[in-house]
Amino acid sequence: MKLGCISSCARSGRARFTVLLLCCLAVLPTTKLLGQRLPSTVRPEHYSLTLTPDLKAAAYTGVESIDINVAEPANTIVLNSIEIEFQSVSVTAGGKKQVATVSLDKEKQQATFTFPEKIPAGKARLDINFTGILNNELRGFYLSRTGRRNYAVTQFEPTDARRAFPSFDEPAFKATYDISLVIDTGDTAVSNSPIANDTPGPGADRHTVKFLTTPKMSTYLVAFLVGDFKCTDGEQDGVAIRVCSTPDRVALTPYGVDVAKYVLHYYNNYFGIPYPLKKLDLIALPDFEAGAMENFGAITYRETDLLIDNKTASVGAKKEVALVIAHEMAHQWFGDLVTMQWWDNIWLNEGFATWMENKPVAAMRPEWNIDQDVAQNLDGTLNLDAQPTTRAIRAKADTPEEINQMFDGIAYGKASDVLLTVENYLGEETFRKGVHNYLAAHLYSNATAEDFWDAQTATSRKPVDKIMESLVAQPGVPLLTFGAPAGGKVQVSQQRFFLSPSIKPDQARKWTLPVCFRSTDNSADCRVLTPNVSALAVPSGEPFFANAGGKGYFRSSYPAGEYKAIVANIETALTPVERISLLGDVWAQVRANKSSIGNYLDLVAAVKDDSNAGVVSTALGGYQTAYVRIAATPEEKAALAAWVRSTFGPVYARLGPPSDSDSANTRELRAQLFAALGEAKDPAILDEARQIALKYIADPGSVEPTLGQTALAIAARNGDEELFNKLQKISETSANPEFQIGALRLLAEFKKPELVGRALDYAVSGKVRNQDAAIQLAIPLQTDESRDQAWKFIQSNWPKVQAQLTTNSGGILVGSTGAFCSETGRQEVQQFFSTHKVAAADQALKHSIERINGCIELRALQEPQLKNWLTTQSRISGGVASR
């Protein structure tokens, strides 16, 4: 599953909207539920399930038979069920049928069937008749609405199959499924397997769609969808591929077909195990809280993560859609074909898919420089993991609450980065063989993390098990402090790194991890650092750099002389990915008060002419954070903005206007510089942005898309009522999700108080889908100009706000309050949410307070140094900013 917030934050670098990163931390339910695993004495083997949904009444009936294997005689059977009404339950075993009494435990989300006599050991069949509702909660079997009709769709991961049909809803209880859907004439149905037959009835206005038997799989991967879907077809390696949508958006499906075809062929070759099904459907849903979900053979998506106009889409949008498609398709092997034994190892599913998604996309579009995006994501994860409230990758998870909270930036980001580190150490081909061996040993079954790294250890004959256990079992980021190379060796010490200098690390915590040095032939020369090692052999050559490839999961600190040598040769001695790594390390040192903001800004100036968009994006991200979180006065902010204009203005000018011959990198670089200069209030850029934005609105095909969308964002942040009205109309009428959601987000970016008020009112008006409302409220909290107004609105209109929050989105809103940077702000946030509880937000509130405290501390320590640096740059004098 790709969470909507995860996919956004994972590729945002140090994006402006830190609210998206917060939702990667913890935004999920905190309802207190008792931990209760199902007994292992009864195991399902096969489900026969017939559902009859009524899309107008938002309800359905179900007829279900479950073939089970009973390990020992018992007169009770326990399975998972919630929000299901049982009509009848019976069991047939040994030729005898018994009718059950049913007792429900809502807290444990279980149903217990009690029978008059013991069921003998061996095979038996449960027969269940039940009814349910098509809920509005975006989970289980739920209703999705468009302007013209309703759809009935599913989202089961992690523990919501039990909301749709009674089931043994744990990943280890794999079974096969025969699914039939009785639906209205004119509707279509999609499920995991191809259609076996489609017959009229029962009744004149219904038809029954029966699907072929599925492979053996876990409940959370089951899917069934009903509505008016239209599809574009393709075929690859003997597999029928379809991308489906509502009828008005089917023109936006061909890009997804092309990407899916490429990715399927790539994965068949990479894994050495062919995709096991005869078809693969990718379906865009109007209402869908996750970014996407890897249902076996029937992957579901948010519309923005699948549907795209290849002619008018920006590079970023094309990249995002391709990566999300590749992520979910990776799960068809890693998660669906082979599934974790229990949710404490969900990181192996999600981390692997996050790591794997980059490979086919990088091969498909080398010009997108995916490796630089990976490096930026790694940098973001290191910052996330350097907070005191982080967790180990593998953590205890028993209740639905605990399981839900496992789907965070650690399970996706850190797990992916650890795999990247190990692959860099072993080499790509050795690592690939280990992946193949792991999958081949556990086909259609369950496995543990130990199974995975044991396969890698056996394949490589290197200590992968020790490295993985070290990085997976303990929280936090290693800080490696290097001495100067001498005699072919370098002294190195390690300790846990925290962004807050007030937190003292546990000196006993150490890691076993590979450290790769740049060798004389420009390859990675790796050594394994263990807790007992204090010196490593290093190859000769200068400058000395200890993270060759930029793929190590650690922060680095160098002696002053070594650091100066690296910076002096940064363009020639380091690759773009390594430059991103160095920028991240230096910024982290600023956050931890081990370096000054002036040192970082000097490094930014050193890479200002870098031709790689990823490097410039990383550099400007640190600057933007300094502008927002360190600069404390209007004069300091104005001085920083003037510095950016003078430093990057000439670079932007040298790029010149867009050309059809521009590479994707050049387009992204131009847009990043344009955005930075717009944020810095460059008058010429603001005028240019307004002109481009209006042209782009009138005819999207007339403007280079990446620049057009950037211009629109700049114009909105400086915009008037006329532009607001244009964007609101697009958000309500466009059939292109990229334009529709892009315009919706920009409504929350306006800064004039009357337009901020309109955007806030609109967010709670009922005209914004629930999956989007929390983000619309969170965005204005991120900037100085609109924060206080947005916070007052949220407090004053809490009943309306709360009505828009879904089960999972409350934490996004609560977490966004971490943008405050004052004692007063912290007190207000704590006080308000102490009396206005949000069920999804306990962890998000902790992270919010942590961010506020971190900002207060960062500003207190670094603001004087920023002022001194601005003075030395002649940007500020006597409290007055220089133009």
Language-model-derived ranges and their functions:
Residues 61-81:
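Ligand-binding face of N-terminal immunoglobulin V-set domains in extracellular IgSF glycoproteins
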Residues 62, 153-159, 166-326, 355-358, ...:
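Hydrophobic helix-coil surface modules that form long, contiguous segments used
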Residues 83-146, 203, 533-539:
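A surface-exposed beta-strand-loop module
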Residues 86, 96, 211, 240-503, ...:
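Hydrophobic alpha-helical and helix-loop surface patches within well-folded domains
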Residues 379, 386, 491-493, 501, ...:
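Long, ordered, helix-rich scaffold segments
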